[in-house]
């Protein structure tokens, strides 16, 4: 081969090499782009899952466990003392919410934003449409000291019930389980 032919051949190979290198660089860039998209999709998926979990927690559709208190209320057997009413339970729930309770249940009926607590008669109270009987066991997850203080302070709901003659016990715990709401959540007035 002559020198001119060698130079031409070398130039052809150099051109082919540069073209192959260019394609390689483009493919590397695409691979990197796909990796970033995959990571972004994973991050998006994780974010969506976290939001779904938080929404389910707020809707009461998941069990919640953490520090908190368990209150047991046994009504007095004396006929001279007024029975425990739905209003008493509502006052306890409201006091717990004000003290920062993150989840509350009464006799394992999860308290939601649309929970109804109503008197049926002197023996029965309905929570979420379910009839509950005494003793009433109220569980609340949150700062256990704050929750207890909200109930036992002077003029607190538990303090008032004790003064009336009802038996009220409050136990602080590092492990309180508030079970999920098993019913269907339906809205009457919200449009889809």
Go through each PLM region and give its residues.
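Core subunits and conserved enzymes of cellular information-processing
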Residues: 1-192
């Amino acid at each position: 081969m002559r020198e001119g032919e060698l130079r031409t051949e070398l130039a052809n190979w150099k051109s082919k090499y540069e073209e192959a290198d260019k394609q390689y660089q483009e493919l590397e860039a695409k691979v990197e782009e796909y990796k970033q998209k995959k990571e972004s999709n994973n991050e998006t998926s994780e974010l969506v899952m976290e939001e779904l979990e938080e929404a389910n927690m707020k809707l009461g559709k998941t069990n919640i466990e953490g520090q908190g208190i368990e209150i047991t209320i046994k009504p007095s057997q004396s006929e001279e003392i007024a029975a425990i009413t739905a209003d008493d339970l509502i006052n306890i729930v409201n006091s717990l919410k004000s003290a920062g309770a993150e989840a509350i249940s009464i006799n394992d009926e999860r308290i939601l934003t649309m929970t109804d607590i109503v008197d049926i008669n002197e023996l029965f109270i309905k929570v979420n449409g379910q009839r509950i009987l005494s003793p009433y066991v109220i569980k609340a997850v949150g700062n256990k000291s704050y929750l207890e203080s909200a109930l036992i302070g002077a003029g607190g709901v538990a303090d008032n019930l004790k003064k009336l003659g009802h038996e009220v016990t409050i136990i602080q715990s590092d492990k309180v389980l508030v079970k999920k709401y098993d019913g269907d959540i339906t809205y009457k007035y919200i449009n889809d």
